[in-house]
Amino acid sequence: MKYLYLLLCTLLGFDTMAQTGQSIEFTQIRQELQKKWPDNRTVNLVFHGHSVPSGYANTPNVKTLQAYPHQVLEAVKEIYPYAVVNSITTSIGGENAEQGAKRFKQEVLPHRPDILFIDYALNDRSIGLERALKAWEKMIKEAQKQNIPIILLTPTPDLTEDILDDKSPLEQHSRQIRRLAHDYKTGLIDCYATFKEKRKNGEDLNIYMSQSNHPNEKGHRVVTKLILNYFFEEAQWNEYCQKQTMTIMKKVADWQLMNFENQVRKGSQWANSHAYWAWTNATMYIGMAEWAKMSDDPKYWDFLLTMGEKNKWQTGPSIYFADDICIIQPYAILFSKYKEPYMIQNSVETLDTLIANPKHNSLSYYSEG
């Protein structure tokens, strides 16, 4: 199971190792998140910025639960089950850093952030580097007066700009934010560099975007993974990866259960292509059996038993056609669990016949298409 989930982590794009924030402030937050009642307290994660942390997707649609502030909350709660955590967004769509700085004392600091995230660069292009710098510095200084740990974010992409252009406005704002993080010793989430690297590696950034300047759920997931480096140690990354992989596997298995009979009834242009014994289903049964071993829900074994009963534990019509006898392996798996001879009786007879009567002539066949 260990190797299976690590493989799936790789295939599904989860990081199993990550560098964590090194500041003692972030270490203290991780320690706070591990405390149990009655020694714990509420931890406030405050996200200040524009439309991206607000959850704007295809404007005017707002998908709050797909945005990185909510994704971070879900992930943190997955690993810190005893923590009381609030994800608070003080962001406003269309706002730039100057506007955000004006309401900072009245609308952000009263939330008493344990960690403050600032994400304004996309909209700061309208006010330029100098004005943006003053606004960011104002917010940073006001937060640091109250000893609030800060994480600055470089922008997510805008597809109307060439992200590979080192002189683009967003690249210039990203450099300025990196300097701010260095000068004020804040945390840094370098979204821009991450997406830029993806583009350099040949990825189409459209798959991460709802519209030209708003990421979709997958794009927000990229930002979330960067943020989680401040919350997870290596062992916690492994645990989170495993839980996320298990969640996805369960969704896939449950979809199969929900839609299986419709697929069998629908069939296709090829006769028997979706019969209970068909190889297409047999391979799915094998995967379902592996999932059933990992899950604590008996419904997956019940599904496989029902399949065997509906199929009367028979193979397909031709013993010399591998597709028609592929179903024997799921039967064997069920027999190994339940030890009921009737589950493999027909399979044993089929294999005995095949061994006793080997074919020496060609098994080629013609199929249209």
Residue locations for each model-derived region?
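Alpha-helical cap/lid subdomain in secreted, periplasmic
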Residues: I24, Q28, Q34, P38-D39, ...
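Well-ordered alpha-helical segments within folded domains of soluble proteins
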Residues: W277-A292, Y320-S336, G369
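Short glycine-rich His-centered loop
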Residues: E32-K63
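Low-complexity, Ser/Thr/Pro/Gly-enriched N-terminal "stalk/linker" regions
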Residues: E239-T306, P341-E349, T353-L354
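Aromatic- and glycine-enriched pocket-lining scaffold segments that form the walls
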Residues: N361-G369
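Bacterial Sec-dependent N-terminal signal peptides
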Residues: M1-G21
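Short catalytic helix/loop segments, enriched in acidic residues and glycine
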Residues: V62-K77, G308-E309
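Sec-dependent signal peptide cleavage junction
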Residues: T16-T27, N238-T247
